[in-house]
Amino acid sequence: GTPIHNFTVPASLKTWIDLVVRVNRSFNITPAGKVGTLDSKPVYIAIASGGFFGSEHSRQPDFLTPYLKAILATIGLHDLRFFSAQGMALDVNKVKVQRQDALDHVMNIGPTIAESKESC
């Protein structure tokens, strides 16, 4: 999971990406372009945000989601599944609802994650 900082990934996640995404390690350059060395498995990405993004209530752009899609595809991860807890800096009751929605989503995908692990 990751928060959104200044419309995109926080510095700590960017540092991790820079350490992992390496030519001849996590991707190779071919005549057809970059080819990831990882076998694509489902990747579940939780995003937390103080405001709203990617909806009719949005007050901020979302550069995080397209960036993660592009950079993870570079290393071979194409099956990305995003879910979010938005508006976390707002009214306490809304935060409780968002938190419960995120928890419900995680509980619903739990069996899917377990099945993915079994197929590894």
Q: In which residue ranges do the predicted regions lie?
A:
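Glycine-rich phosphate/pyrophosphate-binding loop and the adjoining helix
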Residues: 59-120
